[in-house]
């Protein structure tokens, strides 16, 4: 069984989603199925088929969440230290062309959200950063072409 690295925050988020799907969404869907059944003929009952599809999607996600939680390797980022970039690090970069600063935290695949500065450990930029230190330059092949960055800060917060 492959372990899935994630932060404590990411683990808590998965557990909350699982709780919501099991304790709130599942009963709501069951009620919708029951309500749709009461309308009679199921073969042409769009509400019934929509509710059954929602049930299938919800149960699939519940199974996925249970698997992820079982395989989770929760890493307490605040207990990490050092100068090298690794999982959990918050890294400040400067774009070598535009001088624009960007801050990213390297997190597990399930936690990634680029808009909030959380990038997946398996993303091209994170793979380029792993093992590097402050002052190192990296080059990332992005869809818009190669981009160069300098690492100006590495912290574990």
UniProtKB/Swiss-Prot annotation:
<dbReference type="Pfam" id="PF03449">
    <property type="entry name" value="GreA_GreB_N"/>
</dbReference>
<dbReference type="InterPro" id="IPR028624">
    <property type="entry name" value="Tscrpt_elong_fac_GreA/B"/>
</dbReference>
<dbReference type="GO" id="GO:0006354">
    <property type="term" value="P:DNA-templated transcription elongation"/>
</dbReference>
<protein>
    <recommendedName>
        <fullName>Transcription elongation factor GreA</fullName>
    </recommendedName>
</protein>
<dbReference type="GO" id="GO:0032784">
    <property type="term" value="P:regulation of DNA-templated transcription elongation"/>
</dbReference>
<dbReference type="InterPro" id="IPR036805">
    <property type="entry name" value="Tscrpt_elong_fac_GreA/B_N_sf"/>
</dbReference>
<keyword id="KW-0804">Transcription</keyword>
<dbReference type="InterPro" id="IPR018151">
    <property type="entry name" value="TF_GreA/GreB_CS"/>
</dbReference>
<dbReference type="Pfam" id="PF01272">
    <property type="entry name" value="GreA_GreB"/>
</dbReference>
<dbReference type="InterPro" id="IPR006359">
    <property type="entry name" value="Tscrpt_elong_fac_GreA"/>
</dbReference>
<dbReference type="InterPro" id="IPR036953">
    <property type="entry name" value="GreA/GreB_C_sf"/>
</dbReference>
<dbReference type="InterPro" id="IPR001437">
    <property type="entry name" value="Tscrpt_elong_fac_GreA/B_C"/>
</dbReference>
<comment type="function">
    <text>Necessary for efficient RNA polymerase transcription elongation past template-encoded arresting sites. The arresting sites in DNA have the property of trapping a certain fraction of elongating RNA polymerases that pass through, resulting in locked ternary complexes. Cleavage of the nascent transcript by cleavage factors such as GreA or GreB allows the resumption of elongation from the new 3'terminus. GreA releases sequences of 2 to 3 nucleotides.</text>
</comment>
<keyword id="KW-0805">Transcription regulation</keyword>
<dbReference type="InterPro" id="IPR022691">
    <property type="entry name" value="Tscrpt_elong_fac_GreA/B_N"/>
</dbReference>
<keyword id="KW-0238">DNA-binding</keyword>
<dbReference type="GO" id="GO:0003677">
    <property type="term" value="F:DNA binding"/>
</dbReference>
<dbReference type="GO" id="GO:0070063">
    <property type="term" value="F:RNA polymerase binding"/>
</dbReference>
<comment type="similarity">
    <text>Belongs to the GreA/GreB family.</text>
</comment>
<dbReference type="InterPro" id="IPR023459">
    <property type="entry name" value="Tscrpt_elong_fac_GreA/B_fam"/>
</dbReference>
């Amino acid at each position: 069984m492959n372990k899935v690295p994630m932060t404590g925050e990411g683990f808590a988020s998965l557990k909350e989603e699982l709780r919501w799907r099991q304790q709130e969404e599942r009963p709501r869907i069951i009620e919708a199925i029951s309500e749709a059944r009461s309308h009679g003929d199921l073969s042409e009952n769009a509400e019934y088929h929509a509710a059954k599809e929602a049930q299938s999607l919800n149960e699939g996600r519940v199974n996925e969440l249970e698997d992820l939680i079982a395989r989770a390797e929760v890493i307490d980022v605040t207990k990490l230290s050092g100068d090298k970039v690794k999982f959990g690090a918050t890294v400040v970069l400067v774009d070598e062309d535009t001088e624009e600063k960007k801050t990213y935290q390297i997190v597990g695949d399930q936690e990634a959200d680029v808009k909030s500065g959380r990038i997946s450990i398996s993303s091209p930029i994170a793979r380029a950063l792993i093992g590097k230190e402050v002052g190192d330059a990296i080059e990332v092949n992005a869809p818009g072409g190669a981009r160069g960055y300098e690492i100006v800060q590495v912290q574990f917060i």
